[in-house]
């Protein structure tokens, strides 16, 4: 699992962000057909970048708009509508290694912001600003239409597809464009009308992929990551219908546990935005929120607390799974964090935050320093000062990283057998010789960074 993948360049072109880890995974699997393969590949957001396009795509967009007479109001370096999204998906998933991988290994996906636009649904003020632009309606409509076609359909089981009214309508139509358009417009206008989250059971392992973008409630005094229906659905899957499960996996594009300083900074910012320190601080808070991407679980305080309570409840039950693992991406580095409950009965399950990103992208050097600093004792002290200024209560847990941060194009693998669990982290390395077995077309291969037992006997 992992997230954040720019399209790989064409053969022979230089790659400014290094080798694509999915291409290298594909090359390793293809080199030994008898070797063990992943049971499932989880892509945790930013599968495409609608707002950060390649030079080739920008040139195609210009030609297309001139010929079709469309997109005149849209940014020239971003996709504008469904037709342009189809080109973006073709570019992103068209390289031979990735096409083979997606045709060979089952996959589950969920969107994040760049699948539509950076900071998608970060706040009510942001939504109002975007809806005032002349190009936003076509962007969000095309983004949701294409997401349903290229990503979400593959998340549905055969039984779910057989009962899906939209799928039936699309199959029955000669041209399903207007059917899909009406669906996407309704999904944008009324997010509660559609559920993008879903559940998959792999034997005694349950996977819940949670939509943390479209299901938000953005009114400042009642901000939640998940609306009431979505939150109730998640709780039902975790508590009400869990049954005999050895491992519970919660896939959320945005990490639950961040570096502590970042967590408190986001909680402080949310307090400012809802007026805890007055209107002037609220205006500053909104300005800062958009520029610093302060929109993870920590920025939705009640949702963070509810998810934490739900994990503690399932982990403390008589039928507690061996592990509860939150799988995330987004932040362009990888780490392992483990919480400790400071109040109440701690869960019997081992609880982990596994964050792995990017698959094929980069992070500036200054941000690498910041991510490392965010876990330090000094940074925690700064975070506590911000929390005090924002009049924020301490959470019911504290947490430390037990691995990382790691940087580069990387992929985490969970191996679950019975009630045992093992975690592996691998990075795409360009140091291999071209043509060597298990190398991709750029001559890169996977290099092991971490291999750790998570449970006794793992």
What are these regions (language model features)?
Residues 1-458:
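Metal-dependent phosphoester/phosphodiester hydrolase catalytic core
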């Amino acid at each position: 699992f992992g997230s954040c993948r720019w399209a790989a360049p064409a053969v022979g072109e230089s790659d400014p962000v290094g080798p694509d880890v999915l291409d290298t995974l594909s090359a390793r699997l293809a080199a030994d057909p008898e070797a063990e393969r992943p049971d499932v590949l989880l892509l945790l957001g930013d599968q495409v970048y609608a707002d950060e396009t390649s030079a080739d795509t920008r040139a195609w967009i210009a030609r297309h708009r001139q010929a079709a007479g469309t997109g005149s109001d849209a940014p020239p370096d971003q996709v504008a509508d469904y037709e342009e999204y189809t080109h973006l998906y073709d570019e992103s998933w068209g390289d031979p290694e990735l096409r083979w991988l997606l045709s060979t290994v089952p996959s589950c996906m969920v969107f994040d912001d760049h699948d539509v636009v950076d900071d998608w649904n970060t706040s009510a003020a942001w939504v109002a600003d975007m809806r005032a632009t002349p190009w936003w309606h076509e962007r969000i409509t095309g983004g949701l239409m294409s997401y349903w076609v290229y990503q979400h359909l593959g998340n549905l089981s055969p039984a779910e597809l057989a009962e899906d009214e939209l799928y039936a309508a699309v199959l029955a139509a000669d041209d399903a464009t207007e059917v899909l358009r009406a669906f996407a417009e309704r999904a944008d206008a009324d997010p509660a009308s559609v559920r993008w989250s879903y559940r998959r059971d792999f034997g005694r392992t349950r996977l819940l992929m949670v939509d943390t973008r479209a299901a938000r409630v953005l009114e400042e005094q009642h901000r939640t990551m998940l609306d009431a229906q979505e939150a109730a659905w998640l709780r039902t899957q975790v508590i009400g219908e869990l049954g005999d499960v050895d491992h519970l996996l919660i896939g959320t594009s945005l990490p639950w546990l961040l570096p502590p300083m970042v967590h408190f900074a986001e909680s402080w910012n949310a307090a400012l935005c809802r007026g805890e320190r007055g209107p002037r601080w609220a205006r500053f808070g909104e300005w800062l929120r958009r520029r610093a991407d302060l929109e993870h679980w920590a920025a939705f305080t009640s949702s963070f607390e509810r998810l934490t309570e739900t994990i503690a409840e399932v982990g403390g039950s008589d039928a507690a799974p061996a592990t509860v693992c939150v799988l995330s991406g987004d932040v362009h580095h990888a780490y392992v964090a483990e919480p400790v409950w400071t109040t109440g009965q701690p869960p019997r399950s081992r609880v982990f935050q596994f964050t792995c990103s990017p698959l094929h992208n980069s992070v500036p050097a200054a941000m690498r320093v910041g991510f490392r600093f965010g876990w330090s004792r000094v940074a925690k002290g700064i975070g506590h000062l911000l929390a005090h200024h924002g009049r924020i209560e301490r959470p019911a847990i504290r947490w430390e990283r037990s691995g990382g941060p790691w940087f580069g194009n990387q992929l985490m693998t969970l191996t679950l057998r019975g009630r045992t669990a093992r975690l592996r982290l691998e990075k795409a390395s360009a140091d291999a010789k071209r043509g060597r077995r298990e190398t991709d077309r750029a001559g890169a291969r996977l290099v092991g960074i971490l291999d750790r037992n998570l449970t006794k006997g793992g």
